[in-house]
Amino acid sequence: MIVKPENMTFADKKIRMLIAGFPGIGKTTLALSAPKPLYIDVDLSAERINRDVLNMAEGITQPRDYDELRRDLGIGANDMELQAVKSSLKDFETIVIDTGGKLLTIMGQYGRKNNPKYGQTDGSLSLKGYGWLGKEFQRFLDHCIYELDKHIVIIFHTVEEKDGDDTKLRIKAEGSSRNNVWEVMDLGGFMEMRGNTRTIGFSNCERYFAKGTRGVHGVMPIPELVPGVKNDFLTRLFEQYNAVSAEEAKRAAEDKAKYDAAMEKAKQIIDGLTDADSVNAATAEFKAIDHALTSKKESGNLWNAKTAELGLIYDKVLGKYTPKEKEAE
């Protein structure tokens, strides 16, 4: 359905977020601070996670391969099966994937199994396989967002890479697929310790990639979890993100209404112009119009076109419009 831009609020947008960092930094704990998370343990590493952290999840699943994950989430299901999946997931608001690197690996295995052209003899993906993997990752996110109506948070481990004398930090993922991951994310944060404080950075720097939008940027401290304090950092961040979106939409609607009023007023004035006297009489009122967006430029173009049509020019010496002198024949 086509809608006007000013009517798009994005106030309840489902957010796609990437969390990157070294093992042990607390990525899973942070991811489970999202609203009502379903923890999808693709790494099969839940037994290594502190029980108190696991208890933060509303539910846990450990798919052994991408086929099982597709069934769990209703990917490729018929309408009846998809409705059953949606019903089973109704109590969850966020899908947490741990880890994204392993998700891409089992996706690649699924692709090679179903189409030998996607694989090479050494077991790695072919060029065509990587192309499919990027599209499948996008389809996976779209399904979680648009079909299941969930936020999605994907955890990635980090690896160090040498770039000349510098050491860069990059997400750990199979081949070129890691470059496609960032494109589809709304937020991407890199976790690290600064002194004794855990932080997450949402702005690119010389050491790592990150992504911030809707007022989410820079480095944020992550509160230390203590008894009695709720683990809700991402819940509050998502609320802030959508609140900014709602405020932007509100301002856009107000600006559009102001623009429409300005253009209507300008056209009303211009339609009444017939000669130099009427133009000069209307100039002050025209200049007093309260503009928004591009109304000043657009109405100015209409004014200039009308005065040219009437054969008028602005005389800077006299400070008013006068008939243009006819050229001698």
Give the predicted meaning of each segment.
Residues 2, 7, 11-84, 88-97, ...:
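Conserved P-loop
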Residues 9, 29-31, 86-88, 143-145, ...:
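A general structural signal for short secondary-structure junctions and capping/turn motifs
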Residues 9-18, 25, 33-34, 44, ...:
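Interfaces that engage single-stranded nucleic acids at replication/repair/recombination sites
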Residues 22, 146-223:
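Phosphate-binding/switch region of NTP-binding enzymes
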Residues 48-50, 105-109, 193:
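Active-site-proximal flexible loops/turns
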Residues 71-74, 139-142, 146, 271:
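Surface-exposed alpha-helical segments enriched in charged/polar residues
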Residues 99-180:
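P-loop NTPase motor core
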Residues 192-261:
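Eukaryote-biased recognition of electropositive, low-complexity segments
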